[in-house]
Regions:
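Repeated scaffold domains used in trafficking and secretory/extracellular systems
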Residues: 89-114, 159-169, 211-220, 269-276, ...
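Short coil/turn segments that connect the beta-strands within blades of beta-propeller domains
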Residues: 43, 118-119, 172-173, 224-225, ...
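Short loop/turn segments immediately following beta-strands, especially the blade-tip
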Residues: 141-146, 194-196, 243-252
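Beta-propeller fold detector
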Residues: 78-96, 148-157, 200-207, 250-266, ...
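An edge-strand/N-cap motif at the start of beta-rich repeat modules
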Residues: 32-75
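Structural motif
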Residues: 54-69, 130-139, 184-190, 235-243, ...
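Short loop/turn segments immediately following the C-termini of beta-strands
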Residues: 50-52, 125-128, 180-182, 232-234, ...
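N-terminal export signals
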Residues: 2, 8-29
């Protein structure tokens, strides 16, 4: 090889090596940026459904199989589903029972899907049986994105016909719930020790009494810690209510309930209660409610100040939903 050609070859090789190094550095930088972006916890929208269940279940100490789905948080479109098999409770203590002469058959219903502070989920399930009502909690363990499951029975309810109608995580070991009577008024606030499933008898939170003829449901919490729910009276229009556990009435010493605004859609009052409420991490309130036909569930945004609902997805095929990271 002549000196000129050798010099040209060396220059080309050096240029090629430089290009390779630059490309490698760029790839590593891009990968690092992606890793950094991926390191940020991305919010996930979860949904829960209750498929048809077998009457062979031991409903006192087992949960029915459920279907946990993930959806696009912006559109509500379901992207994946996980079948959760029957779970046996890890605290199979006996609860109050009441034999009923008139009984139409066993049934199950999901009353909430709520996220814990660590990103895991809790699913309360109420079963109606000839011996009364049984309330159980399904937990995801480790991570809701790649979950394992366990279950607990709710213990120490006062009567066999009391039912957990909504649920909210207050702290690592404490759950706030709305308790009804066979799913109907009167409703009361109670707290559950999530470590053992027991109703906490002491009212350390000074929780308020609830009007005995009104329906209360759909507990949720905004990023600032304010608690929201719906209250429905004889008119059938759900009203958005809120409370802060630190704000108490001077006279009673109980937590104050603020009645904010009736829910409405397209300028008309929302007739019948919504099926669920939850906040995203950005502070946007969402609702699950029946669509115009009443045959499908739809996902809506909710303006907290006006109660105005805006359609996000007209076919959100879940019974309850929650946001988690």
């Amino acid at each position: 090889m002549s000196p000129l050609k050798r010099r040209q070859f060396t220059q080309l090789a050096a240029a090629g090596l430089t290009s390779t190094i630059v490309a490698d550095i760029s790839s590593k930088a891009l990968a690092q940026n992606n890793d950094q972006n991926n390191g940020k916890s991305e919010e996930v929208l979860y949904g829960i459904n209750l498929p048809s269940t077998s009457n062979a279940l031991n409903r006192e100490d087992q949960t029915p199989p459920v279907e946990l789905s993930t959806a696009d948080a912006k559109t509500g479109k379901v992207v994946s589903k996980t079948n959760v098999p029957v779970q046996s409770v890890d605290n199979p203590s006996s609860v109050r029972k009441k034999s009923r002469a008139f009984f139409t058959g066993d049934s199950d219903r999901i009353t909430k899907l709520t996220a814990l502070g660590d990103g895991n989920l809790v699913i309360p399930i109420v079963s109606n049986t000839r011996d009364g009502y049984f309330n159980r909690l399904i937990y995801t363990v480790g991570s809701a994105k790649n979950p394992q499951f366990r279950a607990k029975k709710v213990l120490d309810l006062e009567t066999a016909d009391q039912t957990i109608e909504s649920l909210l995580s207050l702290s690592k070991d404490q759950l706030l719930c709305i308790v009804g009577t066979e799913g109907l008024p009167p409703f009361t606030f109670k707290t559950i020790d999530s470590r053992n499933g027991k109703i906490i008898s002491e009212d350390d939170l000074d929780l308020p009494s609830l009007p005995p003829a009104h329906r209360f449901a759909n507990l949720c919490q905004d990023p600032k810690g304010n608690i929201f729910a719906t209250e429905t009276g004889s008119e059938g229009v759900p009203i958005l209510i809120s409370m802060n556990l630190q704000e108490k009435a001077i006279v009673t010493g109980k937590v104050k309930i603020q009645r904010l605004t009736p829910l409405n859609f397209e300028g008309r009052p929302q007739i019948n209660d919504v099926k669920d409420l939850n906040f995203s991490s950005s502070g946007q309130l969402y609702a699950l409610a029946a669509d115009k036909s009443g045959k499908k569930n739809a996902l809506f945004t909710v303006d907290v100040r006006s109660g105005k609902m805006g359609l996000v997805n007209e076919d959100f095929a879940v019974e309850k939903f929650a946001f988690s990271v």
